[in-house]
UniProtKB/Swiss-Prot annotation:
GO MF annotation terms: 5-hydroxy-L-tryptophan decarboxylase activity; L-dopa decarboxylase activity; pyridoxal phosphate binding
Top-level enzyme category: lyase
Subunit (UniProt): Homodimer.
Binding locations of pyridoxal 5'-phosphate: 148-149, 246, 300
Keywords attached to this entry: Acetylation, Catecholamine biosynthesis, Decarboxylase, Lyase, Pyridoxal phosphate, Repeat
E.C. numbers: 4.1.1.28
Catalytic activity of the protein: L-dopa + H(+) = dopamine + CO2; 5-hydroxy-L-tryptophan + H(+) = serotonin + CO2
Protein name: Aromatic-L-amino-acid decarboxylase
Example of a GO biological process term: carboxylic acid metabolic process
Entry-annotated residues carrying N6-(pyridoxal phosphate)lysine: 303
Source taxonomy: Eukaryota, Metazoa, Chordata, Craniata, Vertebrata
Length: 480
């Protein structure tokens, strides 16, 4: 493909993408395929000779689209949203064209410097404390990670290195292995599974703190666990507080947990993967109160801030905590400015070496939507969630299982877990809308999350009528 054909095919692809998104609600939101459907549709090995673009694009509809779960459909109400916007897609195209691997300032100055500025822009939108901003000469700063899972792992590994060095400075006879076997980290029992995985990868105990009646981690439960573990000779060093849990969008109490972490010299990491986007709205910013106690903070613009995956924003108060844990300087990566104090080499802030020019997406989206446009997007989703909540409350057969704070509604039929499992199977088998469940204590609960950029009140109303009809059918069968 030469430049001339690329121009022509590129315009065709833009038309295809625009048509796909404009007509997405006419497609089944959940694919009607079985595991292994794709392999018989394609050859068993790559072609020896080039194939035509026409053949490839024809196979998109024949092979790929039948197996796609359409996350951007206005009838997709599962998981959490994946952000999507035309400015972000255009920026991703440019990112692919530039195709730099921005592991250091020298590898691509613009890639590095735009990321630093965009994380400061976003930090100011969230009204983060100045300590988290790079500014002109700040000690903290932001970095784009691939996911919240990566951010949690990076924070845990940095905290682990920091506590080991602190203890060895006080007691040089202590070995790293002796310290490691006593380290213990904490999170709520509502924390995402990636938090437990970070403990597994980091080789440390991860203890889950029982949450309260609102599914939040509180000071009393954390303090009890700390005292018990210290009495047993363990070394508490790391706490993950979740703002907007995956199950039900509950919020750990930063104002309670934060001071304990500071008093005990434990690293506090905040995981706000989903909810963090909402903090750009003044009416939701109070949910972040207590962030000043944290050592690191993370959320995913790629969930709710119209920036396509992947883009997970992470800030730290002390950049040296990350650099101290990850810095390696082989001669082939060194450059003349690295010790100047004027630049950032992001390879020392993350686990991989390579990194894409992801800040372009943020730059395009922030400029083309503006803060007000992004706030309007958040507020629309929250309003639609409350609309769905109101519909559920009007039907006495159903119950709301958790206060609706942002864009997630947790609900269920009154009755057994089996009844609700049957209802969910009916919903997803019909493929008109897509939902996923959660467990809240011993209850099987349905999650209804407003996800699509294109979702409107009509889609919510249609989804509710569909759920009600299926519920009536399930209840009739139960009584039969």
């Amino acid at each position: 493909m030469n430049a001339s054909e690329f121009r022509r095919r590129g315009k065709e692809m833009v038309d295809y993408v625009a048509n796909y998104l404009e007509g997405i609600e006419s497609r089944l939101v959940y694919p009607d395929v079985e595991p292994g459907y794709l392999r018989p549709l394609i050859p068993s090995s790559a072609p020896e000779e080039p194939e035509t673009y026409e053949d490839i694009i024809g196979d998109i509809e024949r092979i790929i689209m039948p197996g796609v779960t359409h996350w951007n459909s206005p009838y997709f109400f599962a998981y959490f949203p994946t952000a999507n916007s035309y400015p972000s897609m255009l920026a991703d195209m440019l990112c692919g064209a530039i195709s730099c691997i921005g592991f250091s300032w020298a590898a691509s100055p613009a890639c590095t410097e735009l990321e630093t500025v965009m994380l400061d822009w976003l930090g100011k939108m969230l009204r983060l404390p100045d300590a988290f901003l790079a500014g002109n000469a700040g000690m903290g700063g932001g970095v784009i990670q691939g996911s919240a899972s990566e951010a949690t792992l990076v924070a845990l590994l940095a905290a682990r290195t920091k506590v080991i060095r602190r203890l060895q400075a006080a007691s040089p006879e202590l070995t790293q292995a002796a310290i490691m076997e006593k380290l213990v980290a904490y999170a709520s029992d509502q924390a995402h599974s990636s938090v437990e995985r970070a403990g597994l990868i980091g080789g440390v105990r991860m203890k889950l703190i029982p949450s309260d009646s609102n599914f939040a981690m509180r000071a009393s439960a954390l303090r009890e666990a700390l005292e018990r573990d210290k009495a047993a000779g363990l070394i508490p060093f790391f706490v993950v507080a979740t703002l907007g849990t995956t199950n039900c969008c509950s919020f750990d109490s930063l104002l309670e947990v934060g001071p304990i972490c500071n008093q005990e010299e434990m690293w506090l990491h905040i995981d706000a993967a989903y909810a963090g986007s909402a903090f750009i709205c003044p009416e939701f910013r109070h949910l972040l109160d207590g962030v000043e106690f944290a050592d690191s903070f993370n959320f995913n613009p790629h969930k709710w801030l119209l920036v396509n995956f992947d883009c997970s924003a992470m800030w730290v108060k002390q950049r040296t905590d990350l650099i101290g844990a990850f810095k390696l300087d082989p001669v082939y990566l060194k450059h003349g400015h690295q010790d100047s104090g004027l630049i950032t080499d992001y390879r020392h802030w993350q686990i991989p070496l390579g990194r894409r020019f992801r800040s372009l997406k943020m730059w395009f989206v922030f400029r083309m939507y503006g803060i007000k446009g992004l706030q309007a997007h958040i507020r629309k989703h929250v309003q639609l969630a409350h609309e769905f909540e109101s519909l559920v409350r009007q039907d006495p057969r159903f119950e709301i299982c958790m206060e609706v704070t942002l864009g997630l509604v947790c609900f269920r039929l009154k009755g057994s877990n089996q009844l609700n499992e049957t209802l969910l199977k009916r919903i997803n088998s019909a493929r008109k809308i897509h939902l996923v469940p959660c467990h809240l204590r011993d209850k099987f609960v349905l999650r209804f999350r407003i996800c699509s950029r294109q979702v409107e009140s009509d889609h919510v109303q249609q989804a509710w009528q569909h759920i009600r009809q299926l519920a009536s059918s399930v209840l009739r069968l139960e009584r039969a």
